[in-house]
């Protein structure tokens, strides 16, 4: 779990920005969104193959 220590006199906006960077870097929100709903294995497989096809077409 990322944490940020706010120093005396440091703006809260800066601390929030640092926290957001840490959360993005660790992929916490992405993982939470992925586990929001259950996806059947067939749906996951279909999405994976679709993403691979999109990547190959570039």
Curated annotation (Swiss-Prot):
Name the species this protein comes from: Chlamydia felis (strain Fe/C-56)
Renumbered to this chain, the signal peptide range is none
A Pfam family it matches: Ribosomal_S21
Q: Where is the composition biased (Basic residues)?
A: 43-58
Q: Name one GO molecular function term.
A: structural constituent of ribosome
Instruction: State the residue spans of region: Disordered.
Output: 39-58
Q: Report the domain of life of the source organism.
A: Bacteria
Xref: InterPro entries: Ribosomal_bS21 (IPR001911), Ribosomal_bS21_sf (IPR038380)
Q: Which UniProt keywords apply?
A: Ribonucleoprotein, Ribosomal protein
Sorted alphabetically, the Gene Ontology BP terms of this entry are: translation
Entry protein name = Small ribosomal subunit protein bS21
What is the primary gene name for this protein?
rpsU
**Would you identify the family this protein belongs to, as annotated?**
Belongs to the bacterial ribosomal protein bS21 family.
Q: Give the UniProt entry's GO cellular component terms.
A: ribonucleoprotein complex; ribosome
